[in-house]
């Protein structure tokens, strides 16, 4: 289908507000049509427009010289050529339409859309080349562009724009896609800025400020005041001739051109002589200098006639007699203060200030002052031997300039792609925040497109991490340990345990096996029930003196946690606990990266209780006795290398420990099953662990060692639940229990048990205020998951709700059987102290690491109600199943 361009119903001349309004309306239609073009169509238009501009480079240059009387014809030809050829070459293969990129794995699509109408303000210094540049990048990005030319260069600017428009339309672009103000005025320029979608502003500080004040996005450039430093290691011939080449290019009207040169004392005379040899004139101090000042500056500002004027002409204006072919007028000055020294300003003409510096540091300081005073963010130049890396580094760090060119003519180097081919070519040079600009690079096509990012839902890559070796079965400890000596060749073992287990002989069999294998060993047996940082430091110090290559932690969660912390201290004593304990939302994206473990020692965990599952988890909790702060550490770096799950090590556990640890296993199983991070790999372990607890905890509690099978099954259940929550994590139940233990000293397993079924009811709500945030958790599903686990455990019902209620009943029966009390108050927690600490306890529970994986994301007010209900034994109200 042939696309129809909007009819041209606007007046031929845009010289008033009504005409401009009509022009912009027509351009809106044209751009809407242009926005539907394919990349192939756009590239054809871009090619033909660039070709037409390049063919007309000489006529356009002549028009610019004739109209403005500024600059050098041949250089304007080069600028036009550059604006057409280099811009086309830079972007001919750049995708600017439709899909820019597509990442199937991450579900990300980036789509280019045009911005709309570009408002372009064109200076008198580079009228035709800037018009070519801005129209070409607008065409490449499917934008319309309206040009507001400088009044002193309106004809040549419009001629350049019309030439590009005609070529573009002939190649298929909509008519009116490029427009201009025929009779420019401040009123119409302000209207352009107000009514377009983005402004490309090139010109003086006042105009750029107006663009940024328009209320529309603006890509404006600040003033340039490029300082040059010539170091005493520089190639003087290269430096001087490069500066002359740059400064005389179009009589200095490129904004990146050199405005001053600072020379080191040892080569000052050499540089000066080289400038003179090459046709530059040093203005004499006194009358000549003052005459030149008076001619060039009016009321402290550059006279509008000066930009682009030849050196000899400026000298004539000042009444200074110089050779007709003088290339540059050089004024030797000392002050960098623009209020005191006019020659420190931007001059946009072949006039250069020259400063003397005793050393490189002073030269850099001078250049820094000049940049900040007159051209912050623009360009700075250094001539130095390439091997002087320290000097180059100092210069680039001190200069607040967005373009720092080394051994390069700054006019040519700043605009890009002439002396360095990685810098994009441009005639609009951003100066960043230092220059009050929105961009700090050379403006190009990427700045004229909006990029839509289409993000499709993806589920997180999950994982399953466990110790590389998990040995189990009653009596397996000596067989598993045999591997340390006979397979791994370990020589020195360090045992970590507590006093009770050590004195009770629980480590003797391990020590005997180590002796049998000829492995030297030492033992730290001072682990506290609530392991402290101070205890861990003592153990780590003893460990460092012994220098083990294997660590064996024997005991319950406390001994294994302490062992992990000592292992970390032994391997990496430089680590800070406050950093390691930082909470995370995603363990793979945490701010702190745990260091690699195992370079010094292999870690073996041997549990003697059936509850924490710490032998196969990446977690450890340590308390700083001096501050009272608990440091919960979580990272797979802390995962033991080997776990030995031998029921012989837990046969003598007393009833109270059996009950508390056993119900802790059940809580681990249930919470890991309904976690938003649960997976098929963890759910099987959670289900099996829960079933084993229902089947074996009553007998293990009642009969103890008389039922070794029940003891072994509980030991296995503890490890399986540990592996499940090591990968799926836990939830609010544990968050609240952690704080009950910390504030009111309830044993952890019992703290979990007393709130377990209340938290389950809370989570099972099908219309919660908030749900957990994780991509693979699409909607509230805890009720179904609870019912699914219950069914695996043999609990029945007509639907999920009934199964869930029966599950709750079965859990309450189990809790009653092992002696779990009904309320927090029943455990002797003082009511007033409970209420006094409730708010702090609530906030800390909310902030607990476990909370994030809970299926229902809790409000603090909800946590508080759960605590109160569990304290007083109130019937659940606002969190019942919906």
Q: Where in this protein do the model-derived segments appear?
A:
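N-terminal Rossmann-like NAD(P)+-binding subdomain of aldehyde/semialdehyde dehydrogenases
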Residues: 2-110, 137, 277
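ALDH superfamily catalytic-core signature
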Residues: 14-16, 132, 208-338
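Conserved C-terminal structural/oligomerization subdomain of aldehyde/semialdehyde dehydrogenase
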Residues: 35, 320-460
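Rossmann-like NAD(P) dinucleotide-binding subdomain of oxidoreductase/dehydrogenase enzymes
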Residues: 99-238
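Glycine/threonine-rich beta-strand-loop-alpha-helix active-site module
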Residues: 160, 534-648
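Carboxylate- and glycine-rich phosphate/diphosphate-binding segment that chelates Mg2+/Mn2+
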Residues: 277, 616-728
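ATP/NTP phosphate-donor binding region
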Residues: 461-550, 824-825
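Gly/Pro-rich interdomain helix-loop hinge
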Residues: 743, 750-834, 876, 881-882
